[in-house]
Amino acid sequence: MTNSNLRTENHFDYVKISIASPQRIMDWGQRTLPNGQVVGEVTKPETINYRTLKPEMDGLFCEKIFGPSKDWECHCGKYKRVRHRGIVCERCGVEVTESRVRRHRMGYIKLAAPVSHVWYLKGIPSYVAILLDIPLRDVEQIVYFNCYVVLDPGDHKELKYKQLLTEDEWLEIEDEIYAEDSIIENEPIVGIGAEALKQLLEDLDLNQVAEELREEITNSKGQKRAKLIKRIRVIDNFIATNAKPEWMVLDAIPVIPPDLRPMVQLDGGRFATSDLNDLYRRVINRNNRLARLQEILAPEIIVRNEKRMLQEAVDALIDNGRRGRTVVGANNRALKSLSDIIEGKQGRFRQNLLGKRVDYSGRSVIVVGPKLKMHQCGLPKEMAIELFQPFVIHRLIRQNIVNNIKAAKKLIQKADDEVMQVLQEVIDGHPILLNRAPTLHRLGIQAFEPKLVGGRAIQLHPLVCPAFNADFDGDQMAVHVPLALEAQTEARMLMLASNNILSPATGEPIVTPSQDMVLGSYYLTALQPNYQKPEFGDNKTTFASLEDVIFAFEDKRLSLHEWVWVRFNGEVEDEDEMRSPQKTQELEDGSKLEIWNLRRDRFDSDNNLISRFVLTTVGRVVMNYTIIDSVSKT
């Protein structure tokens, strides 16, 4: 595109995380400036100049590599202002552009010797050990310069491919090879460190190994078979992603953008810096020292020790503390490596990407709302007025209550009855989403119809608690408002709490009464021994219907556990009842009265039931009436 102000919009199907090749790592950091100069390699451990407070060239904050630290201004100050956009200063080599490029431009460190990636070496499982079919302990011995490994046995009869040799064993074999009477023509080749590991990984033909393993699996059983399956699974993943095993050994290390590992000047003139800068500095110092030792052809033992120290420095940068001693800074505090920044609850993914703050959302403590219906939740007025503010403003203007947005906001701040009336109209039929972290399954976020309540706590129906794994001991929940009509429809149709009764994992009901509800049901239907059973026909305790009993209870003429006679023509089951009536009376009108222990049944001459009075408690009447009422409505 000719105009750099125009932005292109990229659409992605998916994001894939895979191993980066050494060339890709170089491509991330390498750039060709408009004048043809190639920049990107960080070669100096310095950060900023203590006198000028400007970044050092080729250092960890280099303006030539990462971009200018001030908008439209080069390092030396020759070019200032936006009119010089895109020019590369011929004096300092800095491109004149915006300083925000320092948030995404990367660099790289070219390593003087290959180093193993600690994630693939010391992770669980160790992919390097699985691919090479060598125990992890032996792989570590090779990488950290404790043992040699045979890369090519040559003509030596006692040596085998991938065999480990100690220093003394290799010296003995060397004496044997270079003896005057030696008959060995093809000398064996051994290696040590990450270079040897890289050679072993390069020698792997994944397709051939996969074929051999598949043949071997058919004839093996038990633990051996499980081990082969684990190995073939790793190999298949490498083949599927077009990744090469030798990429697990690094030849170059990416340097993340400087604004993501800043250096800030404090009031006293001192500097606070990100731990990553210290870790990068250790790597660069050791890398430069190793390059210098190789240049002057230093003794092998010194070079090898420096390579091991470089390996440990890179390990600490990627994942401090995974292997060996943890690198500490001031006050014996462990330095925060790249892995520490990414992983865990406070890491980049969970804290900043998945757990980021969004508009039209709120958060509050939950309390029980026993009078709510299952698909309802109590939303505090204070929260609702804030969440639904754009809708309320729109309706206030549309109803000509106010003329503009500013006046609407002033009116909303007063929160008078007129605003509350409009808010009530807005939230009617507008579902909201409630989410409780951690959202471990799809029922961790459900839709509810909001009901305005006082206070500052969200009210939740007790039946939906098992799905959220919530209780009322201080749990908090987040509220989200679906804005688009499609989102509202989806929330109502698919996510409403009353539509999510079965667990997606087991298919069994997840909406089950528990704790307070079970206790309440028991208390409601329990029999109290200190209440006397009344005589049948007593005016105070005989009622014509279940509704009459409930009216009397609400009128406080009856207590919850008091015995009453109530007319009920439905089926009655009672374990304490006898098989036959205690007594049968013939009445004057030809009807018959059966006297049972807990009921009175009256039949006509054709044995049809005329009326039935049941002796029960007020609590049991309430329970039965509630169930009958709910069933009849469905």
Curated annotation (Swiss-Prot):
Q: What GO MF terms are annotated?
A: DNA binding; DNA-directed RNA polymerase activity; magnesium ion binding; zinc ion binding
GO biological process terms held by the UniProt record: DNA-templated transcription
* Protein name listed in UniProt: DNA-directed RNA polymerase subunit gamma
Organism for this UniProt entry: Prochlorococcus marinus (strain MIT 9215)
Query: Which UniProt keyword terms apply here?
Result: DNA-directed RNA polymerase, Magnesium, Metal-binding, Nucleotidyltransferase, Transcription, Transferase, Zinc
The record lists Zn(2+) as bound by C74, C76, C89, C92
Q: Which GO CC terms are listed, alphabetically? A: DNA-directed RNA polymerase complex
Task of the protein: DNA-dependent RNA polymerase catalyzes the transcription of DNA into RNA using the four ribonucleoside triphosphates as substrates.
Q: Which family does it belong to?
A: Belongs to the RNA polymerase beta' chain family. RpoC1 subfamily.
The free-text note explaining how the cofactor binds reads: Binds 1 Mg(2+) ion per subunit. Binds 1 Zn(2+) ion per subunit.
What this protein needs as a cofactor is: Mg(2+); Zn(2+)
Which superkingdom, per the lineage?
Bacteria
Q: Kindly report, in one word, the top-level EC class recorded for this enzyme.
A: transferase
Zinc listed as a keyword: yes
Catalysed reaction(s)? RNA(n) + a ribonucleoside 5'-triphosphate = RNA(n+1) + diphosphate
Positions the record marks as coiled coil are none
Oligomeric and partner information? In cyanobacteria the RNAP catalytic core is composed of 2 alpha, 1 beta, 1 beta', 1 gamma and 1 omega subunit. When a sigma factor is associated with the core the holoenzyme is formed, which can initiate transcription.
- Quick one: which gene encodes this? rpoC1
Q: Which SUPFAM superfamilies match?
A: beta and beta-prime subunits of DNA dependent RNA-polymerase
- Pfam family for this entry, one: RNA_pol_Rpb1_2
Give its E.C. classification number. Answer: 2.7.7.6
Annotated binding of Mg(2+), by residue = D471, D473, D475
